[in-house]
Regions:
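Predominantly the C-terminal beta-signal and adjacent terminal strand-loop region
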Residues: 107-152
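An amphipathic alpha-helical core segment
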Residues: 72-113, 121-126
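Outer-membrane beta-barrel translocator domains and adjoining extracellular loop/strand segments
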Residues: 47-49, 83-96, 135-144
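Short loop/turn motifs that connect adjacent beta-strands in outer-membrane beta-barrel proteins
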Residues: 1, 24-34, 61-71, 113-124
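Transmembrane beta-strands of outer-membrane beta-barrel pores
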Residues: 3-9, 25, 38-44, 60, ...
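Residues on the lipid-exposed face of transmembrane beta-strands in outer-membrane beta-barrel proteins
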Residues: 19-25, 38-40, 54-60, 107-113, ...
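A contiguous pocket-lining binding segment that forms or flanks enzyme active sites
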Residues: 43, 48-78
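Residues that define the transmembrane beta-barrel architecture of outer-membrane proteins
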Residues: 11-19, 32, 48-54, 100-105, ...
């Protein structure tokens, strides 16, 4: 069972309850994992012709045999009638278009630089958000970023 919801400055996230099946794959060391989910999704205050969500979550540690290099992330696709902004009227109101299919993935690549000087919690890396009709954004977007991460 899972709950999704919240609000941000830019757009609301419709509250939703999810339940379903989960399939977990891994290698012998658990350094490489893949989690696949097929979920029934009940979205509060929104319509969905197909009340489902597909989710994949992965982790690959020591990628390409390089100690400290990790590739991980998730991908979600679901179906929800929601409004995406396509412009602004002269009076300042948003012009919207209703879309139904939503996709988002956020693959991350991290390297543990701290392992070279006794600070194993310190990582540098990147995340790239790839999305289609997510939030109020119409169409495909690519949003890369760089980061420093401290593992607790």
């Amino acid at each position: 069972v899972e709950y999704n919801g919240g609000i941000t400055r830019s757009y609301p996230i419709n509250s939703a309850w999810l339940a379903g099946v989960d399939y977990f794959l891994h290698d012998q060391s658990y350094n490489n994992t893949l989690n696949l989910k097929l979920l029934y999704k009940k979205i509060i205050q929104a319509d969905s012709k197909v009340p489902m969500q597909f989710t994949g979550v992965w982790t690959c540690k020591d990628l390409f045999g390089l100690k400290g290099l990790t590739f991980d992330g998730f991908a979600d696709v679901w179906f929800e009638d929601h409004s995406c902004n396509i412009g602004v009227n002269e009076d300042g109101t948003n012009v919207t278009k209703t879309k139904h299919t939503v996709f988002i993935t956020e693959p991350q690549l991290w390297y543990n630089v701290g392992r070279h000087f006794g600070c194993n919690n310190l990582n540098v890396g990147t995340e790239i958000e790839l999305s289609n009709n997510f939030g109020t954004t119409l169409g495909f977007k690519c949003r890369p970023c760089l980061g420093v991460k401290w593992n607790f």
